[in-house]
C-alpha cells in the first residue's frame, strides 16, 4: 500500500500538474479528488504544452490508470471537448476512469454562477463562472445530478425537469433573467453522457483494489490550500477541499491509506481573483515576475496577482494538510533580481504574528515582515543539481525549507520535465 497526495500550498497555479506529471512516472494509478474544470494544469512534454482542466495529468502515461473521483464536479461538455483535444493530439484516453458518484455541472449552474457574481457588485469573489459553486450547492442540498443519473435516460429527465423548474423560477423572479429550455439541455447532455459512458465505473473500488495490491497511487489536488473552503481565505475560496484531507472524501479511500503529502509551491506567490494577498507586489518587480513567469490563468487567461514568497501561508498549509515533502517551482523566474524577499511573519497592529488570521479585517491590516536575501544574475534553467545553483539561489532554496519546516524533495528551474531536480525521492522514502 503506497500512496502520495499532491497539493498546492498557495492559491493555486503552483505547478501541481508539472509535479504530478513528474511523480506519475513511478505511479500506477493517478486520481483527481475535487474541483472541476475551473482548475487548469499545464504539462510540457518534449517541449509541447498540453493544457488540461478535468482529466488528470497521468493521462499521458497510457499504461497507467487515470481517475476522476467522486469529489470532482464534472461538466460533461467540457470533458467531451477535452477528450477530443487529447485524441486530436494523438493521446489515448482508454486509461481514463470516471466515478459514477461524481456530480454533474449543467447549464443552469453556470448561469446561476454568473448571476450570483454579478449581484455581488464590489463584493464579488472572482469566480471563474464555471458553475462549480452552484453544483456543489446542489450536492449539499441533495438535489444534485450524478454521473450515474446522467446515464439513465428516465432518471436524468425526471431530475433535470424538477431542478430546471426550480432554477428557472429563480432566474425569472429573483434575477429577471431568461429561463433555460429543458429539451435543449436534455438532448445535449444526455448525448454527452453516452459519449463518456465507456469510462464510468465505481472508482473507489479501483483505487482501493490498487492500494490493497501494493500498487503506487498518486492523488492530484486542484487549486490550493489557501482556496480550501474551510482552511483558505474564506469567502474568497473554491467550493471544495483541496487540502490532503479531501482525498478521503473525494476518492473513497480511507485516511489510513495515505502515506505522503507533497506540497507544491512557487519560489514566489501568485493569485487569480479577489481576496487577501499580504505580500502582493504592485511595482515594477511584480510586473517583471508576472511577465517572466507567464502569470496568466490557464482557465481564465486573466493576469495573476504576484508577490513575494510567504512563509506564513506556507506554514499554515503545512499544518492543515500534513505536508511531508515540498516541491519548489519557478526558481528561475527570480533570476536577475538584485534582492529577493521572503515574508517571515506579519505585523498586525504593531504586534508580530506568525499565523494566518481567519478574519479578513485582520488580514487587511497585516503588513508583511520581510527577510531580504541577495539575488542572483545567472541563467539557471540548465541547472540539474543543487550544487550547480549559484550560491545565492542555493541559499534561497535552503532558507525556504527552513522557514516552512519541511524537507524540499524537488526544485524546478523551468516548465520542462527535465528541469525538475530531485533532492529526495518521495516514493523511495515510503
UniProtKB/Swiss-Prot annotation:
The keyword Nucleotide-binding belongs to this UniProt entry's keyword annotation: yes
Cofactor: Mg(2+)
Pathway(s) served: Purine metabolism; AMP biosynthesis via de novo pathway; AMP from IMP: step 1/2
SS bond partners: none
GO CC annotations, alphabetized: cytoplasm
Residues at the active site: 13, 41
Positions with a binding annotation for IMP: 13-16, 38-41, 128, 142, 223, 238, 302
EC number(s) recorded for this UniProt protein: 6.3.4.4
Residues annotated as binding GTP: 12-18, 40-42, 304, 330-332, 412-414
Chain residues that bind substrate: 298-304
GO term, biological process aspect, one: 'de novo' AMP biosynthetic process
Keywords carried by this UniProt record: Cytoplasm, GTP-binding, Ligase, Magnesium, Metal-binding, Nucleotide-binding, Purine biosynthesis
Domain of life: Bacteria
Cofactor descriptive note: Binds 1 Mg(2+) ion per subunit.
Keyword Magnesium (UniProt): yes
Reactions performed catalytically: IMP + L-aspartate + GTP = N(6)-(1,2-dicarboxyethyl)-AMP + GDP + phosphate + 2 H(+)
MF GO annotations: adenylosuccinate synthase activity; GTP binding; magnesium ion binding
Main localization (coarse): cytoplasm
Localization terms from the record: Cytoplasm
Binding locations of Mg(2+): 13, 40
InterPro entries, per database record: Adenylosuccin_syn_GTP-bd, Adenylosuccin_syn_Lys_AS, Adenylosuccinate_synth_dom1, Adenylosuccinate_synth_dom2, Adenylosuccinate_synth_dom3, Adenylosuccinate_synthetase, P-loop_NTPase
Family according to the record: Belongs to the adenylosuccinate synthetase family.
Classification via PANTHER family: ADENYLOSUCCINATE SYNTHETASE
Complex and partners: Homodimer.
Cited function: Plays an important role in the de novo pathway of purine nucleotide biosynthesis. Catalyzes the first committed step in the biosynthesis of AMP from IMP.
Designated name of the protein: Adenylosuccinate synthetase
Species name: Streptococcus pyogenes serotype M2 (strain MGAS10270)
Phylogenetic lineage: Bacteria, Bacillati, Bacillota, Bacilli, Lactobacillales
Record gene name: purA
Amino acid at each position: 500500500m503506497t500512496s502520495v497526495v499532491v497539493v498546492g500550498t498557495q492559491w493555486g497555479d503552483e505547478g501541481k500538474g508539472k509535479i504530478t506529471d513528474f511523480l506519475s512516472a513511478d505511479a500506477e494509478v493517478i486520481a483527481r479528488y475535487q474541483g472541476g474544470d475551473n482548475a487548469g494544469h499545464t504539462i510540457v512534454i518534449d517541449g509541447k504544452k498540453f493544457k488540461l482542466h478535468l482529466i488528470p495529468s497521468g493521462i499521458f502515461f497510457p499504461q497507467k490508470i487515470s481517475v476522476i473521483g467522486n469529489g470532482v464536479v464534472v461538466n460533461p461538455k467540457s470533458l467531451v471537448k477535452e477528450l477530443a483535444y487529447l485524441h486530436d493530439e494523438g493521446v489515448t484516453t482508454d486509461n481514463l476512469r470516471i466515478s459514477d458518484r461524481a456530480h454533474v455541472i449543467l447549464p443552469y449552474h453556470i448561469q446561476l454562477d454568473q448571476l450570483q457574481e454579478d449581484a455581488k457588485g464590489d463584493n464579488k469573489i472572482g469566480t471563474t463562472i464555471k458553475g462549480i459553486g452552484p453544483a456543489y450547492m446542489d450536492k449539499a442540498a441533495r438535489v444534485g445530478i450524478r454521473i450515474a443519473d446522467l446515464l439513465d435516460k428516465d432518471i436524468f429527465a425526471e431530475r433535470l425537469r424538477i431542478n430546471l423548474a426550480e432554477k428557472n423560477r429563480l432566474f425569472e423572479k429573483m434575477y429577471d433573467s431568461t429561463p433555460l429550455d429543458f429539451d435543449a439541455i436534455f438532448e445535449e447532455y444526455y448525448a454527452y453522457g453516452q459519449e463518456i459512458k465507456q469510462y464510468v465505473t465505481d472508482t473507489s473500488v479501483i483505487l482501493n483494489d490498487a492500494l490493497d495490491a501494493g500498487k503506487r497511487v498518486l492523488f492530484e489536488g486542484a487549486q490550493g490550500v489557501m482556496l480550501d473552503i474551510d482552511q483558505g481565505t474564506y469567502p474568497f475560496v473554491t467550493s471544495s477541499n483541496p487540502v490532503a484531507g479531501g482525498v478521503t472524501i473525494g476518492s473513497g479511500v480511507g485516511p489510513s491509506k495515505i502515506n505522503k503529502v507533497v506540497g507544491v509551491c512557487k519560489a514566489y506567490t501568485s493569485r487569480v481573483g479577489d481576496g487577501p494577498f499580504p505580500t502582493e507586489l504592485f511595482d515594477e518587480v511584480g510586473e517583471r515576475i508576472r511577465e517572466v513567469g507567464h502569470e496568466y490563468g490557464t482557465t481564465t487567461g486573466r493576469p495573476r496577482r504576484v508577490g513575494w514568497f510567504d512563509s506564513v501561508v506556507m506554514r499554515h498549509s503545512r499544518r492543515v494538510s500534513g505536508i511531508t515533502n515540498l516541491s519548489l517551482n519557478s526558481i528561475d523566474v527570480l533570476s536577475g533580481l538584485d534582492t529577493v524577499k521572503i515574508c517571515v511573519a506579519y505585523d498586525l497592529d504593531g504586534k508580530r504574528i506568525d499565523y494566518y488570521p481567519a478574519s479578513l479585517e485582520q488580514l487587511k491590516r497585516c503588513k508583511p515582515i520581510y527577510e531580504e536575501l541577495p539575488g542572483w544574475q545567472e541563467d539557471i534553467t540548465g541547472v540539474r543539481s543543487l550544487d550547480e545553483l549559484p550560491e545565492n539561489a542555493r541559499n534561497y532554496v535552503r532558507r525556504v525549507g527552513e522557514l516552512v519546516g519541511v524537507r524540499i524533495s524537488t526544485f524546478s528551474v523551468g516548465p520542462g520535465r527535465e528541469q525538475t531536480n530531485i533532492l529526495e525521492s518521495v516514493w523511495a522514502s515510503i
